[in-house]
A protein has these predicted regions:
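Histidine/acidic-residue-rich catalytic or RNA/ligand-binding cores of hydrolases
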Residues: 16-20, 48-52, 141-150, 168-183, ...
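Extended substrate/RNA-proximal surfaces in nucleic-acid metabolism proteins
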Residues: 43, 48-160, 213-222, 230-248
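Short acidic/histidine-rich active-site segments
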Residues: 42, 187-202
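Histidine-centered catalytic micro-motifs
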Residues: 5-15, 39-42, 132-136, 193-195
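N-terminal pre-domain/capping segments
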Residues: 8, 12-27, 56-57
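Hydrophobic "anchor" residues on beta-strands that sit immediately upstream
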Residues: 3-5, 36-37, 71, 130, ...
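Alpha-helical scaffold segments that flank or form the walls of functional sites
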Residues: 23-37, 60-63
Length: 248
């Protein structure tokens, strides 16, 4: 049985279309028995997102809130087919957890498979990126088998996003093909809620668990399935946050 020991993709009301404070999100994660929570508000190119100053100042928050370690991160926006992100490296390198995602407000239109494949291959080379966010989207289908091999080589975690069934249903069907490619490539994945409120935490997790069970996905490749696996993954990313998370 797959379980989630930490959520690596959540938002707070700093992203104005979300609803809860970081303290409230941390408290809810603690009550769910999580070992850690990543708070990853949208990069500044996204409408309703925080100013770039936020991503400097978030590092000054306590490392532990409401009794749970908090990874202070960002969901950076991919801005073009060259894989350019909307936050500079000096900001990204100071964060605990960085997601790279495509949002249509920042990269409108539909990409060809070739364009999307090239885009993600370039993102894979960015050492500041830790995880690839909701990349199953219908408008940006890429060569999953080719790219997940490169993701694995560069220690990129591929997100399986529980919120996609609600907000990106047209692409949710691609999740199985993406997961199968990760299984074949030995590429790590994370099961996340992409919650924008405490009421969405664990959103879609049941769908994700059933999907992994259906394809007999190796539990050891699910990086947030236990504190130990999360700790091991963070060490691969050279994150100082490992000192705040116990690995059992």
């Amino acid at each position: 049985m797959y379980r989630i020991a930490a959520d690596l993709h959540t938002h707070t009301l700093v992203s104005n279309h979300a609803f809860n404070t970081i303290t409230e999100m941390a408290r809810a994660a603690k009550e769910m028995g999580y070992c850690a929570l990543a708070v990853t508000d949208h990069g500044p190119a996204m409408p309703d997102s925080p100013h770039i100053w936020y991503f400097y100042n978030v590092r000054r928050l306590p490392d532990v809130l409401e009794g749970i370690p908090v990874l202070k991160g960002a969901e950076a926006n991919v801005m073009d087919v060259n894989g350019t992100l909307d936050l500079p490296s000096e900001v990204l390198n100071g964060l605990d957890w960085v997601i790279a995602s495509i949002h249509t407000d920042c990269l409108p239109g539909t990409l060809t498979v070739e364009q999307a494949t090239d885009l993600w291959l370039k993102v894979a080379e960015n050492p500041a990126v830790d995880m690839i966010g909701h990349s199953e989207q219908a408008k940006h289908v890429y060569d999953y088998e080719r790219v997940t091999k490169v993701f694995a080589e560069h220690h990129k975690v591929v997100e399986l996003n529980g919120n996609s069934w609600a907000v990106r249903p047209e692409g949710a069907g691609n999740m199985k093909a993406l997961a199968l490619a990760c299984k074949k490539a030995g590429c790590p994945v994370a099961l996340n809620s992409d919650a924008h409120s405490i009421y969405q935490m664990q959103a879609g997790v049941g769908h994700l668990v059933r999907l992994l069970e259906e394809i007999d996905f190796p539990e050891e490749l699910v990086v947030n399935s236990s504190p130990r696996r999360l700790l091991e993954e963070l060490k691969l990313h050279n994150k100082p946050v490992v000192e705040r998370i116990g690995g059992t």
